[in-house]
Each structure stands twice: as C-alpha cells, then as structure tokens.
Amino acid sequence: MNFKPLGDRLLIQRVEEANTTASGIIIPDNAKEKPSKGKVIAVGSEVEDINVDDTVVFGKYSGNEIILDGEEFLIMESSDIFGILI
C-alpha cells in the first residue's frame, strides 16, 4: 500500500482490544466498542511529535474511516490524538 497523508493528517490502523474481561467473561463481537487506540501507519509532512509505528490514543469518534487494499484505516488530524503509549 502506498499512501501519504497530507498536511497534519495521520493514517492509523486500529488496535483490537481483548475479547475477554479481567474476570474471564467473553465479550461478543456485536457488543464491543471500536477501539480508541491504534498504530500509526503513515504521517503527513506537518506532523512533528508522532512517528510511524507509534501506538496512539484518540477519541472514540475521531477520524474518517477508509478502506485501502481491503483493510480498514482511519485518517485523522494530529490534534485528534490525545497521546502516545510508551
């Protein structure tokens, strides 16, 4: 896949959460919320503090979903990122 976000935008792939709770209860797919963290796949030329392969946390409704090569990604502005997981 060749995709370069413009300006201060990032291309992010969601990171799936665990399917069970701490007590061992299995959460069905239709009851799960979309994850609010993801891996940075590509960054635009104006993004300064976030790098490719960083895992970031963002708002539940941030970004726009797109499909590239059959996979789902989010495109969002860097201001939608709350922080980087270290």
Curated annotation (Swiss-Prot):
Tell me the protein's name: Co-chaperonin GroES
Q: What is the role of this chain?
A: Together with the chaperonin GroEL, plays an essential role in assisting protein folding. The GroEL-GroES system forms a nano-cage that allows encapsulation of the non-native substrate proteins and provides a physical environment optimized to promote and accelerate protein folding. GroES binds to the apical surface of the GroEL ring, thereby capping the opening of the GroEL channel.
Q: What is the lineage of its organism?
A: Bacteria, Pseudomonadati, Campylobacterota, Epsilonproteobacteria, Campylobacterales
Question: Which SMART domains does the protein's record reference?
Answer: Cpn10
In the record, the note on similarity to other proteins reads:
Belongs to the GroES chaperonin family.
Provide this UniProt record's keywords sorted from A to Z: Chaperone, Cytoplasm
Q: Where in the cell is it found?
A: Cytoplasm
SUPFAM superfamilies for the chain: GroES-like
This protein's GO cellular component annotations are:
cytoplasm
Q: How does it assemble?
A: Heptamer of 7 subunits arranged in a ring. Interacts with the chaperonin GroEL.
Q: Which GO terms describe its biological process?
A: chaperone cofactor-dependent protein refolding
